[in-house]
Design a protein with these regions (language model features):
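Flexible phosphate/Mg2+-sensing switch loops adjacent to catalytic phosphate-binding sites
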Residues: 82-117, 145-156, 196-197
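Walker A/P-loop-proximal flanking segment of P-loop NTPase domains
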Residues: 1-72, 79, 85, 237-270, ...
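Substrate-engagement module of ASCE P-loop NTPases
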Residues: 158-167, 192-217, 240, 262
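Conserved P-loop NTPase "ATPase switch" module shared by AAA+ and STAND
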Residues: 165-195
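A short hydrophobic beta-strand->loop->alpha-helix junction that borders the nucleotide-binding pocket
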Residues: 68, 118-127
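Amphipathic alpha-helical segments of the small helical/lid subdomains adjacent to P-loop NTPase cores
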Residues: 225-327
Length: 327
């Protein structure tokens, strides 16, 4: 069928899910993979490019917030940001390779900020009791500054302490499932006002990222914009990526097809249109011809864009199958 090649991981008897985990104990998480390997299965959607531009040299300060429900691609996007920070040269080369395909020469000039350490975590996994535990554990200078914090006998780290640590090693903190984690925090934990302390520390990180972007980038994902978790970040006028742009649906389809097939983009639109012409004509006759106002060419283009699936099946794959967690 026009030489279309399914990616190897989908050729077995049991198809894996495509849900992304930033890190897994078996080192099979998205951030555990080599950047070239992960970028190979990544399609540069408009939202992803917007997020990458938030990492550019000379960028404005402030948090970056990804807003969207299940299956929107937030975790995949965050994994790309992680690799971009830790491997900027590889990411810039990848962008350059896509510049001609997308007819966007500006991608050749997109330069990722250098010198940051990415610290990424699906925070709702609850591997850490507090955000500062995560930072002290993963940051290159974390052990020293953890000692300073413990010696201070304070209930949360001082802003000056965190700024010193970030100044020694600039940091990009990426927190997936931030709202899920925050909403589940208890009011009290081991005598500590856990939610209040988290609220205060989030505010601190947001302010540092706004006022001192040269030492801290702060990126989180939330499900919606009416939660306490989001409102705390909203004070610092974050960049919002909401997956609701004009091209979001088409981008999502292209992302899925690129994720499933190795060479879908290498097959010409003319060949696809020729192959699907009869089906597209009958689909239009059965579903749209009685409505009077449907654009036949637009409907045919929709069929070509979704090939090798029908538009209805691709929607089903996205909603019910591909976005489920692998068993």
């Amino acid at each position: 069928m026009l030489g279309l090649q399914l990616r190897k991981e989908f050729q077995g008897a049991n198809m894996p899910g495509t849900t992304i985990a930033l890190h897994r104990s078996n080192s099979q998480g998205a951030t555990d993979k080599a950047p070239q390997e992960f970028l190979k299965i990544t399609y540069p959607t408009a939202d992803l490019l917007k997020a990458l531009r938030s990492l550019r040299e000379g960028r404005d300060g402030g948090p970056v917030v990804l807003i969207g429900g299940r299956g929107k691609g937030k975790s995949h996007l965050m994994a790309v940001l992680h690799h971009a920070i830790n491997s900027p040269a590889i990411t810039e080369k990848w962008l350059g390779n896509w510049a001609d395909t997308l007819h966007d020469p500006s991608l050749h000039d997109l330069k990722i900020s250098k010198g940051y350490q990415a610290i990424s975590e699906t925070i709702s996994d609850n591997e850490y009791n507090t955000l500062w535990d995560l930072l002290f554990d993963r940051h290159k200078k974390g052990e020293f500054y953890k000692g300073q914090f413990v010696a201070s006998n304070q209930h949360i780290p001082a802003r000056s302490l965190m700024e010193q640590m970030f100044a020694e090693q600039p940091t990009c903190l990426i927190l997936d499932e931030f709202q899920t984690w925050y909403d589940a925090l208890p009011e009290l934990y081991n005598g500590l006002k856990a939610k209040e302390c988290a609220f205060s520390f989030i505010q601190m990180l947001s302010e540092i990222s706004k006022e001192r972007p040269e030492i801290l980038m702060f990126i989180v994902s939330v499900r919606n914009n009416n939660s306490d978790a989001f409102m705390q970040l909203h004070r610092q006028e974050p960049m919002l990526i909401d997956f609701l742009g004009e091209t979001a649906k088409q981008d999502r389809q292209k992302l899925i097809l690129h994720r499933l097939f190795e060479n879908r983009l290498n097959i010409s639109n003319a060949d696809i249109s020729s192959l699907t012409a009869t089906y597209a004509k009958e689909r239009f006759r059965l579903l749209y011809s009685q409505k009077g106002t449907a654009n036949a060419q637009k409907i045919a283009d929709e069929v070509s864009a979704c090939w090798p699936y029908s538009p209805e099946l691709l929607n089903l794959l996205e909603d019910q199958i591909l976005m489920t967690t692998a068993a």
